[in-house]
Swiss-Prot record:
Record note on quaternary structure: Monomer.
GO-annotated cellular components: cytoplasm
Keyword DNA-binding: yes
Organism field: Escherichia coli
Molecular-function annotations in GO: DNA binding
One family name in Pfam for this protein: NikA-like
Name used for this protein in its record: Protein TraJ
Gene: traJ
Keyword annotations: Conjugation, Cytoplasm, DNA-binding, Plasmid
InterPro entries cross-referenced by the UniProt entry: NikA-like
Length: 123
């Protein structure tokens, strides 16, 4: 039998695409945002695959910070709800301010999450 080997991409002829420098730069930026090489990005797009980007680590860091803030605020609220003696000096105004701060952090968390899920939705 003849020795048949499967063709590889490196052994196949490339497809050349002519584009303007700003078009190339835009494609390179999208490939980098997806965490892919330019070749892999163009191959995936050309075959109709949906490209999913790499999660922005800055967003992840911000989410972790907000989560920590919510945990601390929730702990204070829990102390107050259990009638802990350390919270006896907390008045209604303090508790209402705490609840407002928790709601503010939840809104902030939602905005960051939308930035991760739909990064190109905002101008």
């Amino acid at each position: 039998m003849a020795d048949e080997t499967k063709p590889t991409r490196k052994g196949s002829p490339p497809i050349k695409v002519y584009c303007l420098p700003d078009e190339r730069r835009a494609i390179e930026e999208k490939a980098a945002a997806a965490g892919m090489s330019l070749s892999a990005y163009l191959l995936a797009v050309g075959q109709g695959y949906k490209i999913t980007g790499v999660v922005d680590y800055e967003h992840v860091r911000e989410l972790a910070r907000i989560n920590g803030d919510l945990g601390r605020l929730g702990g204070l609220l829990k102390l107050w709800l259990t009638d802990d003696p350390r919270t006896a000096r907390f008045g209604d105004a303090t508790i209402l301010a705490l609840l407002a701060k928790i709601e503010e952090k939840q809104d902030e968390l939602g905005k960051v999450m939308m930035g991760v899920v739909r990064p190109r939705a905002e101008p």
